[in-house]
């Protein structure tokens, strides 16, 4: 990204670990990235790759935009986590980079369920925000949201791309969300500041270690996938079971 952005380009892939990540590792772990709603996951970006098998043999999957027939063998190696091969080179798609066209939207609400419903409505309407995120109160507090949304959930969208597209996407999303009586708008600058501190470099990791030592608690992200019909129940179980089963 550091090399591409001065050229007006981006891969569109932005994991939280971006400052310390390597592309082979992101492909090997099937990284999803924070902008996946717009650009897709890493599996949607990889055109071709090179890998080394346990035997030492080097294999290459050709860089073509689509496989016309048969299984897509890229997906044998994408996400293999080193069990089948070490990924040594990847070829990915590139997109135009528009850093001046971002829009930041946020709302607070009292429960996760209406937040999931809003996310579904936005996606079903065909809008493609770069970020679509719903924080429960506890998770939001770790980002400092308890200063304005104490014991509340926070719903966030960001948009990017050509000026007209980004603006239209932001306007369309806002129209859908503002129609819900459960939500209250959040100051745009709060969301902008949150966005500016999404990624963790070495300094942030050192801070986290010190926090763990001092407070004797830690938190990690667990990726969960579910259909709209079950995701609220999955979220409820995921949040409540660890605190009630012990």
Model-derived segments and spans:
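FAD-binding subdomain of flavoenzyme oxidoreductases
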Residues: 1-133
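Intrinsically disordered, low-complexity segments enriched in polar/charged small residues
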Residues: 35, 242-243
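C-terminal substrate-recognition/cap domain of FAD-linked oxidoreductases
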Residues: 92, 96, 106-239
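Single conserved hydrophobic/aromatic residue that forms the stacking wall/gate
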Residues: 238, 244-246
């Amino acid at each position: 990204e550091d090399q591409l952005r001065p050229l007006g380009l981006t891969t569109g892939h932005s994991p939280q670990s971006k400052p310390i990540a390597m592309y082979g590792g992101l492909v090997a772990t099937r990284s999803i990235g924070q902008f996946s709603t717009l650009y897709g996951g890493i599996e949607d970006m990889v055109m071709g790759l090179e890998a080394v098998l346990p035997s030492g043999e080097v294999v290459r999957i050709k860089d073509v935009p689509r496989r016309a027939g048969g299984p897509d063998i890229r997906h044998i190696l994408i996400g293999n986590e080193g069990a089948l091969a070490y990924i040594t080179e990847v070829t990915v798609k590139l997109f135009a980079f528009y850093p001046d066209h971002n829009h930041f939207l946020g709302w607070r609400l009292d429960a996760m369920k209406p937040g999931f419903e809003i996310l579904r409505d936005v996606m079903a309407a065909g809008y493609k925000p770069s970020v679509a995120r719903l924080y429960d109160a506890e998770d939001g507090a770790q980002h400092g949201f308890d200063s304005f949304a104490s014991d509340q959930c926070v719903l966030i969208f960001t948009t990017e791309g050509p000026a007209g597209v980004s603006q239209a996407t932001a306007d369309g999303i806002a129209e859908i969300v503002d129609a819900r009586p459960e939500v209250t708008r959040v100051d745009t600058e709060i969301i902008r500041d949150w966005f500016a501190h999404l990624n963790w470099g070495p300094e942030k990791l050192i801070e986290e270690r010190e926090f763990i030592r001092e407070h004797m608690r830690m938190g990690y992200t667990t990726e969960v996938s579910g259909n709209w019909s079950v995701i609220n129940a999955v979220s409820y179980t995921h949040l409540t079971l660890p605190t009630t089963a012990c």
